[in-house]
Amino acid sequence: MVGGCCGRKILESRDEGELGYASLESKSEIPGKIMIDHVILTVSDFKRSVAFYAKALKPLGITTFIDYEGKDGHPDLKGFGDGKRYFFWLKEGKPDPQAVHVGFVAKDHSEVDAFYKAALAAGGKSKESPQARLEYYPGYYATWVLDPDGHDIEVVNKS
């Protein structure tokens, strides 16, 4: 498997070297190896966004933070992680919310629901309340919120 989105696996054809889509035959599992190392999201108000994500991501177990002081033209960053690694970063600047969609994995439906409540309480706006989206994938249960800058943030469980 090369990658996947919205319930479809993108497979590499060994014969032709082309990429194609294939249906999933079994229920999704949280992969043992994540192929994306990190995401940096540009936000307009650093303090506001740090406060929002600290509260909104807590139900997902993303509870540790690190400050990175940029040097030689690199921006200051705030990193979020699970205690083992930092993979979600914020930097201050001019955001382009239409250019970004970030999806976080939840271990079950209750984590999806808890994220939604926490995100709204932290100042996020509902895009879609937690619900099954079986047209994406069997067992696809997700919610979508807009962060304070309007970035589209999804939390999904595929069980």
Describe each model-derived feature in a short phrase.
Residues 5-6:
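Cysteine-centered motifs
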Residues 28-50, 102, 159:
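N-terminal beta-strand motif that seeds the catalytic metal site of vicinal oxygen chelate
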Residues 37, 64, 153-158:
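Long, contiguous binding/interaction regions
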Residues 44-47, 103-148:
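Vicinal oxygen chelate
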Residues 74-116:
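Long, continuous compositionally biased terminal/linker segments
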